[in-house]
Amino acid sequence: AKDIMVMRETDRPKLAYVLKRGEYQQRGEAVGPETPAALPAFPAGAPRNRLGLARWLTAPDHPLLARVTVNRFWQSLFGRGLVKTSEDFGTQGEQPEYPELLDWLAGEFVRSGWDVKALHRTIVRSGTYRQRSFSSAEQMADDPENVLLARGPRHRWPAEVIRDQALAVSGLLVEKMGGAPVNGYDAPESFKQIGRAHV
């Protein structure tokens, strides 16, 4: 017989305590599961557990999750987010450069049922994304960081993409999914002598 691993809520969850000076033997007052005071409270009737947390995070009126997610995907496609400080959406982070666009994309993302492919499709089919990345010296001087989104995204490729491109150009890229790993440098052509050193 096979066992299926599942999680189940306990009848009496363990209490958590404020620990005085961080020492586990010096318990302070008991604390219950709740959201931070600066954020909206759990929905009425939501359980105070992981399910309640998930429902709270994905509620359509939650101010952060959809915006942070959209900003991260925008950053991956454009090289920088609509909010430049993507790791800090709080009061110490920067304000969005296009708040209406961020709100609209976040709303569309929630309305699509949190469909990441639909979000990507919306962004990459936009006129902003499909612009040429070339610009004149004058445009570069006026807007070096492309804050105005007047040209297409241009950012560095990650190492994996560079490797795949090098393998594709050399004819060594295997497009089949799965299988044994391929070391592109083991090909016999890789070891041809291309010059002779004078000793």
Q: What is each stretch, according to the model?
A:
Residues 1-198:
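Primarily short, surface-exposed interaction patches in extracytoplasmic proteins
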